Amino acid sequence: MLTLTTLASGSSGNCTLLSDGETHLLLDAGISCRRICTALAALKIAPESLSAVLITHEHSDHISGLATLHKRFQLPIYTSPGTARQLCYRIAALEDVVRPCPPGNSFTAGGLDVETFPISHDAAEPMGFAVSDGNRKAALVTDLGVVTEAVRRGMAGAQLVLVEANHDVEWVRSGPYPYYLKERILGRQGHLSNEDGGALALGAVQSGARTVVLGHLSRENNTPQRAFNAVNAILSAYGPREAGLTLSVAPRDQTGPVYTV
């Protein structure tokens, strides 16, 4: 059995817990260490019992709590070599605990197998993760401007997926952001729109996913209902929704439900 719980998911902070009941993995640490510890306590998990922290990339909404988390608990950190260099440049104390893993490779953390795959984002060497207990698989991918074959392969066969639905394209285009920021968001190294996230979710469902969680929504350029409606329409357009298929949106600033596969 695998469980996934988002502690925060959005442009202002991202942190997710994956667990099989014995091995607990934290994916990103983009909220304060205090918030992480409070959320874990509510789930009856001691922070020191975490097996590892997995970091997708070095942007602040994914690592803002990492320095304090390391200072208190000295947990092993798995990330790509490029991200590892960025982390150690910013937080020298991490050099002893960072374990680089090139995208496309895999490793074992506690009792869980972790696959990595490259993603397209404006960071040093970003990557997504897929975690398996040998029978069940969960895949998580946000912060990407385009869905590549490597992403599809990495997510294939996952029963539970967390995918990005960052923005409504027309809201970005007509909104107050400066031109360069609009181009960044909409570009190939930016973020997935609701429609792009829906297409990715559809592919995941067609390869076995039964739980789809939408994450990393923009506060300014999206709403949970708008993201849900857009993705639900894409899933429904390819036939009646399959029995047992769950679609939901991760909360931005609070702990979400515990999803189990």
Residue ranges and their predicted role:
Residues 64-73, 88-89, 222-229:
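Metal-dependent catalytic neighborhoods of phosphoester/phosphodiester hydrolases
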Residues 33-79:
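Active-site metal-binding motif and surrounding structural segment of the metallo-beta-lactamase
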